[in-house]
From Swiss-Prot:
Species, as recorded: Streptococcus thermophilus
UniProt keyword terms in alphabetical order: Activator, Cytoplasm, DNA-binding, Stress response, Transcription, Transcription regulation
Family matches, as Gene3D superfamilies: Nucleic acid-binding proteins
GO cellular component: cytoplasm
Gene Ontology MF: a single term: DNA binding
Name by which UniProt lists this protein: Cold shock protein CspSt
One Pfam match: CSD
Compartments where found: Cytoplasm
InterPro entries in the record: CSP_DNA-bd, NA-bd_OB-fold
Annotated CSD domain residues: 1-21
TM helices/strands, residue ranges: none
Inducers of expression: By cold shock.
Amino acid sequence: KNGTVKWFNAEKGFGFITSED
């Protein structure tokens, strides 16, 4: 899957990814 990370919180270790299928 290809996607772009819009936001990533390294402190918590997660982020929001917008994937274009």
